[in-house]
């Protein structure tokens, strides 16, 4: 019998073993769709971004008008820009749900996969931040000024570090140029880390909702999960296209329709919605260095999750107390997101402080404590 080229060709067999004949657990739910959706998001962002870069000028005097020109005069430029801007939002929706799935089902016990995932999240956040600066509107400029300024809180080297990042004594032309270079480069870095992430995942195989070994019952990825992923894609594409075509500016800030002006500070400087939870934690501490440390900890805490797992069961499927705590954490993050969008005044200050405190308490203290309690209740 002639050898199957899909299984014998040096390149095709890698694709085959990753996407076609990959043995997958027979019971993974729709929560396992988000990995492939993230891959689609990344591909879409790279393609639309490449097309936008062809019409963009990374210069303070031309950036704003070059974006306006793209939307007005380039064939389907408005569509490409709207897809790119809202694609970022959907990228973050998918990654948050993907991380939530990992937390709920104990996927973090695959430590290498989890750690590369956290690095991916950090790189994505960096990419989104530098990208938001490129249209050179008011919120772009002041967002860049405020967030880069946080590095000045680092003792001794802070101020030097900030001026080195800016390429001068304020956010100006050199800053915009390097941010464009970084925004172009980072998605390809993300692609590289994604391949590493997948490589680590395929060493162990996927986890499943029961958290038990699925070696006794595997099915091929194609056609079962390839089809299921296409369904998930269709379900994500519907709200994505609805948003991008009907209300493309819904999630943006109206302030960014005004060209950047270093002499006028916007009344409320706030980042895009997907950073608001971290921004709320930053603002809740009335000290610059403390706030910066809390901001970093709010994301880096994910690296500690595998070490805080005290339960004898991997997933939360059969652990109602941990489930209640998990959904409390979700509600807490929604409150932080909302508070981050509000002005710094009573009662938002105290709400933000309480929500920030409970965020760290739930993750660092309550999850391990409840896990241990459940072990005792189940006589493990």
Curated annotation (Swiss-Prot):
Topology term for the membrane: Multi-pass membrane protein
Pfam families: Cytochrom_B_C, Cytochrome_B
Residues involved in a ubiquinone binding: 202
Coarse class of the protein's main subcellular location: mitochondrion
Protein residues bound to heme b b566: 98, 197
Cofactor(s) needed by this chain: heme b
Compartments it resides in: Mitochondrion inner membrane
Lineage: superkingdom: Eukaryota
CDD domains in UniProt: cytochrome_b_C, Cytochrome_b_N
Subunit structure: The cytochrome bc1 complex contains 11 subunits: 3 respiratory subunits (MT-CYB, CYC1 and UQCRFS1), 2 core proteins (UQCRC1 and UQCRC2) and 6 low-molecular weight proteins (UQCRH/QCR6, UQCRB/QCR7, UQCRQ/QCR8, UQCR10/QCR9, UQCR11/QCR10 and a cleavage product of UQCRFS1). This cytochrome bc1 complex then forms a dimer.
Additional free-text comment from the UniProt record: Heme 1 (or BL or b562) is low-potential and absorbs at about 562 nm, and heme 2 (or BH or b566) is high-potential and absorbs at about 566 nm.
Annotated family: Belongs to the cytochrome b family.
Entry function: Component of the ubiquinol-cytochrome c reductase complex (complex III or cytochrome b-c1 complex) that is part of the mitochondrial respiratory chain. The b-c1 complex mediates electron transfer from ubiquinol to cytochrome c. Contributes to the generation of a proton gradient across the mitochondrial membrane that is then used for ATP synthesis.
Protein name: Cytochrome b
């Amino acid at each position: 019998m002639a050898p199957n080229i899909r299984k014998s060709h040096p390149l095709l067999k890698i694709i085959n073993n990753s996407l076609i004949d990959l043995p997958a657990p027979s019971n993974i739910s729709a929560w396992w769709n988000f990995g492939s959706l993230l891959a689609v998001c990344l591909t879409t962002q790279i393609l639309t971004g490449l097309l936008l870069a062809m019409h963009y000028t990374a210069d303070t005097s031309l950036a704003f008008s070059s974006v306006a020109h793209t939307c007005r005069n380039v064939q389907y430029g408005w569509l490409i820009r709207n897809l790119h801007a809202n694609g970022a939002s959907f990228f973050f929706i998918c990654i948050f749900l993907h991380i939530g799935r990992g937390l709920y089902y104990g996927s973090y016990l695959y430590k290498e996969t989890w750690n590369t995932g956290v690095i991916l999240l950090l790189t994505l956040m960096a990419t989104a931040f530098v990208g938001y600066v490129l249209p050179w509107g008011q919120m772009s400029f002041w967002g860049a000024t405020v967030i880069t300024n946080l590095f000045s809180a680092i003792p001794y080297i802070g101020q030097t570090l900030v001026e080195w990042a800016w390429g001068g004594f304020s956010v100006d032309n050199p800053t915009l140029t390097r941010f464009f270079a970084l925004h172009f480069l980072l998605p390809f870095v993300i692609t590289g880390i994604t391949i590493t992430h997948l490589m680590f995942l395929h060493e162990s195989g996927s986890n499943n909702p029961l958290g038990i070994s699925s070696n006794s019952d595997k099915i091929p990825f194609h056609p079962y999960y390839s089809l299921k992923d296409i369904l998930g894609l269709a379900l994500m594409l519907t709200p994505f296209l609805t948003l991008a075509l009907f209300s493309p500016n819904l999630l943006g800030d109206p302030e960014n329709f005004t060209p950047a002006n270093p002499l006028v500070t916007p009344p409320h400087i706030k980042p895009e919605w997907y950073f608001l939870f971290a921004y709320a934690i930053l603002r809740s501490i009335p000290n610059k260095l403390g706030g910066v440390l809390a901001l970093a900890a709010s994301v880096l805490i994910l690296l500690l999750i595998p070490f805080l797992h005290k339960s004898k069961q991997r997933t939360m499927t059969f652990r109602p107390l941990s489930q209640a705590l998990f959904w409390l954490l979700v509600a807490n993050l929604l409150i932080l997101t909302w508070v981050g969008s509000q002005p710094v005044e009573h009662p938002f200050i105290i709400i933000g402080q309480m929500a920030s405190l409970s965020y760290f308490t739930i993750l660092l203290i309550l999850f391990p404590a409840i896990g241990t309690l459940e072990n005792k209740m189940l006589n493990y």
